[in-house]
Amino acid sequence: MREVISIHVGQAGIQVGNACWELFCLEHGIQPDGQMPSDKTIGGGDDAFNTFFSETGAGKHVPRCVFLDLEPTVDDEVRTGTYRQLFHPEQLISGKEDAANNFARGHYTIGKEIVDLCLDRIRKLADQCTGLQGFLVFNSVGGGTGSGLGSLLLERLSVDYGKKSKLGFTVYPSPQVSTAVVEPYNSVLSTHSLLEHTDVAVMLDNEAVYDICRRNLDIERPTYTNLNRLIAQVISSLTASLRFDGALNVDVTEFQTNLVPYPRIHFMLSSYAPVISAEKAYHEQLSVAEITNSAFEPASMMAKCDPRHGKYMACCLMYRGDVVPKDVNAAVATIKTKRTIQFVDWCPTGFKCGINYQPPTVVPGGDLAKVMRAVCMISNSTAIAEVFSRIDHKFDLMYAKRAFVHWYVGEGMEEGEFSEAREDLAALEKDYEEVGIETAEGEGEEEGME
């Protein structure tokens, strides 16, 4: 089997995780107590969903995941929630005091005490796997736990499981909506290790997802539950081919191979279509061409950045439901003729497509309409550099005055780490700039380079 272990770190990671496992259970017909009436083989079995769930002798399906937080409240929601019987109590790890939005607490002082326990639990999960494929890590980089403990854990996973790929689903700070004053510090420090220790990072940001909920689902005041359910659909589409059988299946390492042209350039934009409320879906015919087009709309992007300001290097389209390869090819051909969607000149093909026959599932009573087909796009675009430059700018404003730095130094960090991380990100912005420069023809640009 090609198993995948999911690791949910900090409040954002756990809440997104909750939405994901709720959706995975619905997709596979697994009840909140872990029983799966449709599954006839007791024990292991070589079913496709075993990549994400392990089976006990009693026929109970247990998610291959751990939830980690430095304070108990968010973990307690899982312990008392609908799916409390689904998880093994040892999979929910929480500390006593939180990271207080401080990267240094999550990475050095408090995180250090809990990280070995986390790795033990992960080792137990890994030992149950016959062919571990890699890890999915869910966190946000604005807070203290997601950024600090998340980074620490990624660094340790690189040591313990060197060759295994790590995909990050990372919630980045939004341009307007902020949850903490020190977000820019935490994000820069955390991205520094995401650069080195993840193979692919999918960037999400709350504001972009809020806007999608407001605009497409007519939810006036979206809650985190609305946001997370939408994010869960994206993650479900990306992992559908690991959990179901389909025509063009895509495995975790295939993402890397097709999306990452250079090791550092691995921050992805994602979008999902159709995001549509039940009232509207009834009146619309959503063809493959239409959902493909809307996946490329700047407004569909799950991070606040405009792909029209950059060029695409590669792009993965994961279709699910009633889709045939012929329609996909036609839709992609149309996209290629559009002038607004530009690819870098050194990557002429640029598209990888996957098709999975399992139609999209929605949470009953949720906001999304049940549709016949959906597409999730994950793309590598030079425009993502906007997200970094925005955070870097905020970082610079605070760091010039050394504001709030004493909180980090007091937890055992050195001031040099700030400048080191900041330089790394400056280099990353430059990398993105260089990748987008025309190679052969642009004469004028060459002169500007010298």
From Swiss-Prot:
It holds the Pfam family Tubulin. The active site is at residue 254. Mg(2+) binds at residue 71. InterPro entries: Alpha_tubulin, Tub_FtsZ_C, Tubulin, Tubulin/FtsZ-like_C, Tubulin/FtsZ_2-layer-sand-dom, Tubulin/FtsZ_GTPase_sf, Tubulin_C, Tubulin_CS. Keywords: Acetylation, Cytoplasm, Cytoskeleton, GTP-binding, Hydrolase, Magnesium, Metal-binding, Microtubule, Nucleotide-binding. The modification N6-acetyllysine is found at residue 40. The keyword Repressor does not apply. GO terms for biological process: microtubule-based process. Disulfide bonds: none annotated. Signal peptide: none annotated. PROSITE patterns: TUBULIN. It catalyses: GTP + H2O = GDP + phosphate + H(+). One of its GO terms (molecular function) is GTP binding. It is found in: Cytoplasm, Cytoskeleton. GTP binds at residues 11, 71, 140, 144-145, 179, 206, 228. Gene3D superfamilies: Helix hairpin bin (1.10.287.600), Tubulin/FtsZ, C-terminal domain (3.30.1330.20), Tubulin/FtsZ, GTPase domain (3.40.50.1440). Its cofactor is Mg(2+). Acetylation of alpha chains at Lys-40 stabilizes microtubules and affects affinity and processivity of microtubule motors. This modification has a role in multiple cellular functions, ranging from cell motility, cell cycle progression or cell differentiation to intracellular trafficking and signaling. The keyword Glycoprotein does not apply. GO terms for cellular component: cytoplasm; microtubule. Its EC number is 3.6.5.-. Belongs to the tubulin family. Tubulin is the major constituent of microtubules, a cylinder consisting of laterally associated linear protofilaments composed of alpha- and beta-tubulin heterodimers. Microtubules grow by the addition of GTP-tubulin dimers to the microtubule end, where a stabilizing cap forms. Below the cap, tubulin dimers are in GDP-bound state, owing to GTPase activity of alpha-tubulin. Dimer of alpha and beta chains. A typical microtubule is a hollow water-filled tube with an outer diameter of 25 nm and an inner diameter of 15 nM. Alpha-beta heterodimers associate head-to-tail to form protofilaments running lengthwise along the microtubule wall with the beta-tubulin subunit facing the microtubule plus end conferring a structural polarity. Microtubules usually have 13 protofilaments but different protofilament numbers can be found in some organisms and specialized cells. This is Tubulin alpha chain. It comes from Oxytricha granulifera (Ciliate).
